[in-house]
């Protein structure tokens, strides 16, 4: 659109690159979407009280959301390739905003599954980590790890801003009013994306940020022919490489131990220990603050250090934190210690995982390959969202779920060493990088 071109020209005259506007818009988009994903975790008890649904029932609807959220990843990449970033993201934000708004009028359980399971799952899946991977690869030739770190940290920022506000609104004005800020944020961002988002740097006459001077500005055209079968073809190729299975397996555990368990059940878990929703949401916000720092730092580190070592540290630290949580006694001190150590690596696993996927499978395929890896992440989240709710219903405690997730994270830390050191990964064609 002319608005984006004019802004790009104005920035260029001042020595600024339009790619950072794309980063800002993507950051706010992911922030709004993540707020929509995180808010239902604060509404388990209010929904249970109003409609008589138990934790297991509500968790099953949220599990549908996580599953669709992840399964959209590979197809989000192809949709962005075929229809453009802007069109896909506008549709996605419209779905999320509509799902949030319609949920305020629900009266039946299937309404919850449709609005917060299907609509929220599909919409948020189109604006998930795959969007960050595509933006960083298309718009940047340098600082990709940092950009992925910044964009990934948006989910922590959304939690930091919206969860305490949402919990306060639930207590004072009811759960329906808690939905309003998230709906407004998604609606506003849909307009902003329509005005500012562009598909590639060449759309505004630019090279990717960091491209060498003299590099030709390439015409905006897909790098490879894509069809609906392309994600499955990419999956078949990636599945022959053990790096894919290690990254998918560890990311399954990542989703299981974060979105599915802590994001969904932490406020309910604290309620079992006698902690109200507002203090519990404040602890989640504290985790978000530490995660904001940890994820951006992880992006910076992933550009400079062995990403296997980073993932080993992140998964190990997370596993120990989860194993310790039941013994924290849920005091202010205990929860603060947990929030710090768990929060620092909540989503810090993403930049190293994206870097390893890109180094192994190449720039053009990295988006779709990471889409499948992210699908594993969200399937893990779905398993934990339902499984932890089931455990809570049957045993009246979340402790077995915490112990299982902690042990799984330690397993993920060990699995990382199956990957060979990618010393010259960027220079080795994907077919040669294939594991024996």
Identify what each model region corresponds to.
Residues 18-55, 73, 261-267:
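Extracytoplasmic
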Residues 116-153:
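Cytoplasmic helix-loop-helix junction between adjacent transmembrane helices
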Residues 47-48, 79-80, 161, 165-173, ...:
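Interfacial helix-cap and linker-helix signal at transmembrane-aqueous boundaries
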Residues 31, 99, 111-126, 252, ...:
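Hydrophobic core of transmembrane alpha-helices in multi-pass small-molecule transporters
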Residues 71-110, 302, 308:
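Conserved MFS/SLC helix-loop-helix module at the cytosolic interface between two early adjacent transmembrane helices
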Residues 40-44, 236-295, 384:
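Extracytoplasmic gate region of multi-pass secondary transporters
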Residues 154-204:
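Helix-loop-helix hairpin linking two adjacent transmembrane segments in secondary transporters
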Residues 279, 285-291, 297, 302-356:
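C-terminal transmembrane helical hairpin of 12-TM major facilitator-type secondary transporters
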